[in-house]
Structures are given as structure tokens and as C-alpha cells.
Amino acid sequence: MKKEIKKNKYIIPCAIELVLALFFIILILLPDREYSVDISGSRYNESSDTAAFSRNNSEMYRYVTEPVSLPMGRYFLKVNYECAETSTIIYVYNGAKVIQSISLTAENNIQSLETWFSRLSNPVSCTFLSNNAAPVKIDNIVFRRTDYIYYMGLITVILLFTITCFAGLIDSGRICPTKEETATALLLVGMIIISCIPLYNDVIYLGHDSRFHLDRIEGIKEGLLSGQFPVSIYPLINSGYGYATPLFYGDAFLYIPAVMRLMGFTLQFSFKAFIFMINAFSVIAFYFCVKKITCNRKYGLLGAFLFIFSTYHFSDTYGRASIGEITAWGFFSLIVVGLWNIYTMDVDDKRYSHQWIVPMIGYTGVIESHIISTELVAMATVLTCLVLFKRTFKLKRFLNLLKTASASIAVNMYFILPFLDSMKNENVVITRWKDIDCAMQANGIHLADLFRVDIPQMFLEVRFFREVYTGLGIAFGLGLLVIIYVFIRYRQKAVKNKPFIFFS
């Protein structure tokens, strides 16, 4: 009897959560509800003292639409119009309060925004300006309610279902994590949460490339809405004319925040959630990589800690906002652990023939994330193969490396071929470096500066950036000395399974 009660303690909540999940899925599958604002009923606002006024020697008139009742939720507002002045603005009112505004530009005929209504019923109206000299023609104003609330409910139910199932498995004894495993999991979760502290607010810290990546996310979303898949042209860029950014910058992983945008989540939340996912993946990947190589759980935690809390990682994530680069980092660990398995595993092991899969996934992730990282990883891989040439050119190992390279290229051919074709035939800045003086030699540093650790007198001058920030620094220099010492110390010993030799 007690066992039956113990089972029902988890079965009944799971059943309720499954029913709720099915309910939210049905609501999501229903067509989006659209609410049209009655433009024909627009009236001149005679009650306002400022309804008529002069601007540029022409009489301006403020018009108000009939209110439409909107239920609580997140909405996309779309305006189709024609106007001759870019200064025309549509104000969106919820009752007597202005909640949003849209600037109507003469260059476009469609504008859109998103807004949120928190009350159960919201009397929404719009006002706009027009004059006889440059009249504004509003074709239609449509509010489309998104499934944001339903998706939030579905995600919440799925999380509760996962927690309930996991608790049931632990309670039933089917999963018995040790204290060490529990502590490891808690430490990894703690690293992820702490590393994402800058995300826990209602603003976005705009780094160097934030606007560019936000435009990419919105570009994918709008491209999907226009019927493109995969999205080759971002419609929003260049005043609606679009731009083929995906030809030069892989965006496979940006479909995650773009789909979140389609679900009704805000751009800010989608962007932050994506960074959170990247940090979580990177921490877990680095942990398993170092643990696999060192066969030590503590070293795995140390490696993940040193990575996620490194100054460069924080600068890259929140200062430079190099989303492509930080996405690629998580896949670096897959490449390292994959090559480690290929070079250290017994070639006669039955599992050896499948060891190309993990590094192939790693190379694919880097290619789809960041081109510069791809070049660096390719050079590092070639150098590793040459340094370990005695192992590289053994038949089975060489075949595994060959399968890794060929599979990585084949899987990403849809991106690589257009990229190479565009680099060769398109007139872009990177291919005209001789004309614009952006050669590597003009922006590099002297060999001596690479090892500088002092701060030059020209602290505020341009050369300071090249001399200090691109120098290796004290930490790297000391680390290099340690590696050289260890290598010399153990050079005459059997170090087949010593991980530091591989890393060095």
C-alpha cells in the first residue's frame, strides 16, 4: 500500500502536467488572433486644444481612431501607410496613456513594433498627424496577438514535469547520484548562474557588436516570416532593401533566439537567453573535456571555472559582445577532446572507428559560429598533426582524421561554397585591403612588443592598444616557462598518458 502511494505521489502530478502541456499546445496551434483598427472611423480630435497647429507654414491635424478592445498579451503592431514626410508619428494609446509610438518614414510603407498589454481588457486607439500639404494615408493598422503567454505556460509545465520525473527517479532509487556527483552538478550550475549575473536586469549592455547581432536575430525572424528558409537575405537591413550577411557569417545557432522572437519573446529576452545557453553549454563542455583528458573530476571543475570566469571571456561576452566567438568556444572543447581520443585511444579498439564524430561536431559548430575562429582552429589542428606526425600517419589514425576533415567540410558545404564564391567574386572590403590600407602589417605589432609587460608612456595614444593589449603578458609568460620546465623535466620518461604534453 505504501509503495502504491509512493508511486501515485509522482504519477498524478506528471499526468496533470502532461494534460496542461497538451492544453497549451492546442492553444498554440490555434490561428493567431488579429485585431484591426478601424481607420475609416478616424476622426479629427476637436476636443484637444492642440488638435490643430502650424508646422512649416502648414496646418497640422491630429486624428484619432475608434478604440478596439484587446485582451492581455503580447502583440505585434503593423502599419501599412503612405506619407511624404518622415516626421509623421503614430501614437498608440491604452486608454488615456501613451504606451508606444511609431515614426512613419517616407522611404518605407510598412512599420511594425511589439507591445505588451497587462490588463485583462485594454481600450486601444491610435492617433496620427496629417496636413493638406503632405497628407498621410493609413491603409490599415493591425494588432496580432502572439502566443507568448501560451509558450511561457508550456515551458513552465515542461520544467515542472522534468523536475517531477527526476525527483521520482531519485526517490524510487533508479537514479542514485553520489555526494560527489551532486556537488559537481551544483558547482557547475553555480558557475553558470554567477557568470550570467550581468544578464539579470531589464536592460541590455550594448557592447561593440551588440547592435549587429541584434540585427541578425531580427533579420532571421523577418526572413522566416517572409517565407525564406534558410534565411539568405536579412530583410530589415539597409532600410528594407536587405543584405546577405549569412554569406559571410554563419548564423545556424542564431535561429534559436530568432525562433524565440517568433514565439513572442522580446528581442532583449531572446538575446539574453541565448547568451545564457552559450555560457551553460561552454561550462559543461569544458568540464567534460578536461575531465576526460585528466580523468579527474576536480580538474574538470577547475578547467570550467578558469574558462568561464576568465577576464577575456567576460570582456568578449559583455564588453565586445562577440556572440559568434563565444559560441565557438564551447565547440573548441569538443575538438580538443575529439583529437585527444583519436591520438590516445588504441586503434584496435572497436569504438575507435567512430571517434571522428565528436571533433566533426566541434568543427561544424565553429564553422557555423565564427570564421576567424575557424581559421585559427584549422591552423592549430594542422600544427598539432605535424608535431605528432609519428602518430598522425598511422593508417587507422590518419583515416579517422581524414573522415573528420571530410565530414566537417561536407556537412557545412552549404555555407562554405557561397562564402568562398562571395570572397572571390564580390567587391567587399576584406578583398580590397590594398586599396584601403588595412593590411595585417599596418596594424600589427613588433616581435619585441609581443613579450612586453610594462606600460608605455603613450598611455592614451593609439599604439597603446597594439603594444599592451596584444602583448602576451606576465601570466602567459610564466605559464610558458612552466610548460617548458615540465617538458624538459619529463622528456626522458614515459609520458604517453600525460595530458600536459598534449596541451603544450
Question: What is each stretch, according to the model?
Answer:
Residues K7-R74, E85, Y93, V98, ...:
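Glycan-recognition and processing domains
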Residues S69-K78, S121-P123:
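Extended extracellular/luminal ectodomain segments enriched in beta-structured repeat modules
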Residues L77-V79, L113, V124-C126, D139:
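Hydrophobic residues positioned within well-ordered beta-strands of beta-sheet architectures
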Residues N80-A84:
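Solvent-exposed strand-to-loop "edge" motifs in beta-rich extracellular domains
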Residues A96-S121:
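Extracellular carbohydrate recognition and processing domains
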